[in-house]
Amino acid sequence: MEFTENYNPKNKPIMVLGTSSGAGKSLTVTAICRILKKLGEEPIPFKGQNMSNNAWVDSNGGEMAYSQALQAFSCGINPSSEMNPILLKPQGDSTSEVIHLGKSVGISTAKDYYKDWFMPGWEVIKKSINIIYEKNKNCRLIIEGAGSPVEMNLIHRDLTNLRVAKYLDASCILVTDIERGGVFAQIIGTLELMKPEERKLIKGILINRFRGDLSLFKEGKKWIEDKTKIPVLGIIPWLNDKFPPEDSLDLLERKSYLSNPEIKVGIIKLPSISNFSDFDPLENENSILIEWISEAQNLNQFDFIIIPGSKQTIKDQLFLNESGLSKEIKNYSHNNGNIFGICGGLQMLGTVLEDPFFKEGSNFNSDQSIKGIGLLPLKTTFLKHKITRQIHSESIWPNSTKIIGFEIHNGITKLDSSHLDTLKTNHIFKDFDLGWYKENREGGTIAGTYIHGIFENDEWRDHYINLIRKTKNKLTLDKKSRSYKMKRESIINNLANEFNNHFNISLLLN
């Protein structure tokens, strides 16, 4: 290895590979990180390349996948972009924005990615590993793979799986999802497609999402171990009722089952939705039911509507127009409706979207300037470079409190002075360009912010939900809701405890 002077051989890296996408790699890494932290180690998460529009911004303004940020929280450390040196952010038509060490470095098609970005990507992965070991000489890397490590048509350009495992001589776990069926074929097939030197890296197998009596798989466990000569380190029970699905706490496939919710929230499911982890704090409120809206419908059943962030704001605005959702959102606003936009959602609530540099999907439309929904008097102009930074501010509305979060967006948004509602529109934060709101004549409020993570601010969230309650003539709550960060810690601890009960990590460490 090229970094031996910074590497403590006692803390051999652990890598979690999967027999497929969605096998449980992300949650397994999250659990291992917390288990090792409790054992007194210094775990640090790492994923060489991730593809996601669910992102986080570190203290230096660097973008990284939210799943690696969550894993860093599990380690009890601050997220940093070298934990996820390559982030690919899909933006439609088989193209992605390429992020290296937190910074946007270009756009690539799937076809050209290997030719243009493979070698630069491998260099940035090695550089990031060196940075981590230089800063943390006693750490143990807990590495997440991506998809299957043996996609034979792609293996020569796979930056995330066996190339990293061999480079680090990592102790690898192979995770498989028994819920999907065919678990024996998944395990044997994956191992058979590996080269002998790759297969030697696999130190254990983990069966994930087992329903029912674990003792019923005793013979299956023995068969796998006899056939592969690799120990089955654990059989993890079905945890989906307790924990979020694969890919970083996303809510897109989750369903709420509250029989009598006090607050009903509708979130617009945009084609290019980004940062859906923004809604985890709402999902964790016992009184709130979330539903995703993907087609035009009467919205009056909802206490408030959220328009989320977007990777392609103009393209998603066109979707709202063509689907009829834009009209339904306007109708809802005239009927005591409450609407909240985040980032791209804020921009779409405005009057005008201008895209002179084709940054936000206007190449799908001959006109580079289109109308927004028009519920806030705001004009957004998209520029060549985007803004990524952490936010430390203070709110003015609906209460005064400290606010933390982060921005990831292209475009500058200003009040549209030609609009009659300008005087009725107020700032939400002391930093004026972070958000605006206005109260409807018909009742209800229209508001939006550039701050991702806004609902993680417990006091602000409590006051905003109470404001919604007032507009819907519901009782306001005097008690404070549980801290979202404490709730997240509880979720991670429970996850680690479940894994600890069913996973022989000491066998792996020894």
Curated annotation (Swiss-Prot):
Residues 262-460 form the GATase cobBQ-type domain. InterPro entries: Class_I_gatase-like, CobQ/CobB/MinD/ParA_Nub-bd_dom, CobQ_GATase1, CobQ_N, CobQ_synth, GATase_3, P-loop_NTPase. It comes from the Bacteria. The active site is at C343 (nucleophile), H452. Pathway: Cofactor biosynthesis; adenosylcobalamin biosynthesis. GO terms for molecular function: ABC-type vitamin B12 transporter activity; catalytic activity. Belongs to the CobB/CobQ family. CobQ subfamily. This is Cobyric acid synthase. The lineage of its organism: Bacteria, Bacillati, Cyanobacteriota, Cyanophyceae, Synechococcales.
